[in-house]
Amino acid sequence: SLAAFPEIAVKALEAKPASRHVDLEKLTRDFLLHDDQPHQSSSGFGQPELIVYDNPKFYIQALFWLDGTTDIHQHEFSGAFQVLEGSSIHSRYVFENAESITAHFRMGDLKLQETQLLERGDTVPIVSGRSCIHSLFHLETPSVTIVIRTQSDPGTGPQFTYLPPHLAIDPVQGDFLTLRRKQLLDVLEHTASPEYASLILKMIGTLDFERGFFTLQNAMGHLRNLGAWDQAWAAFSKKHGALAKPVLPSLLEIIRRDALVAMRSSIEDPDHRFLLALLLNLESREAVLAMVARRYSGDPLENIFHWAVELTHCSESGTWILNAEFPDDIELPPDEQAPLFLTALNHFLAGGKTPPELKSVSKKNLSSLRAALESSAWKMLLK
């Protein structure tokens, strides 16, 4: 039965672990040089996805990941996956108080259940439907997983993607009119059309809730740059009343998560990616410190600060620690910005008395430094 398949897949992978029995170089060569391969899908999941065995009821795939971070999602299939190469941060969630707005749009409360570090040889069951909501943040390049999965499990769709803390959407719904409208709005953004904001406002006034949300989600970044976001949100909120209330926290969380995921593509060091994964997926300072302590020896805060030093970037445009920018209102030569910014970060991470290096800094400038860090990915870790 379908209910038994995840356990069957786990036992098969654990009985003959891919990490010990699959030669990745040979698999790559054979796939490139021999045409006698199973039928390949058009799926965009994986970078790439290789189907290495196909059966009418199930198939086996090798998923490569270069800079991929999966959305929080559920599955319309069941089975299991095993880490062949690399490691990942794996997070599980539950979606409580769920309410269907349409067949493709749900509201509720997404709660983090568990976060674990998956390493080579670790195996995880996949249960179709809403009882298995998860995400993966891959640390090494490449990371490779072997998946044994059914073709599709009837009655377990749609395969929702979750937008914390409150929304679930069907990413493959066939609303092609909304798709084309979003693409056309992208053209107007690219060409700096002066009508962009006014057209969005008119659309928000006429579109239903679901289409209005997707339009806002697509336009949010440009509307903020134009200074028109507050007006657009007010129009959406006025039109939809209490139904709109859970939307804003999810839209703001999209901005935070997208910023962290975007940094992942330019960061290859596994330790730095590990920090990004924790900042993206965990919800408290204590949880981050516990996960760092689990993987690395030494003081977790010292490890985090060491990574912060390595992640500091100075250029003509400014000084950055991850996505925290040195404040414009502090007048300081460029070569002195990074030492001050890092000293402030170290102080706000550890708490306690002000260190000697910061005693000469004015309260106003110290507040600006803290505000810059609080508006970035570092916020969760500050004391």
Question: Where is each model-derived feature located?
Answer:
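Low-complexity, highly charged intrinsically disordered N-terminal segments
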Residues: 1-35
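A short glycine-rich, His/Asp/Glu-containing loop-to-beta-strand
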Residues: 46-66
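Conserved short histidine dyad/triad with adjacent acidic residue
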Residues: 60-74, 127-129
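Short beta-strand His + acidic residue motifs that chelate non-heme Fe in jelly-roll/DSBH
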Residues: 71-72, 90-91, 114-117, 126, ...
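Glycine- and acidic-residue-biased ligand/ion/polar-headgroup-sensing regions
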Residues: 76-96
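A short hydrophobic beta-strand segment most commonly corresponding to one strand
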Residues: 80, 140-156
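Short acidic-glycine-tyrosine-enriched beta hairpin
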Residues: 82, 95-128
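Charge-dense, extended regions
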Residues: 303-383
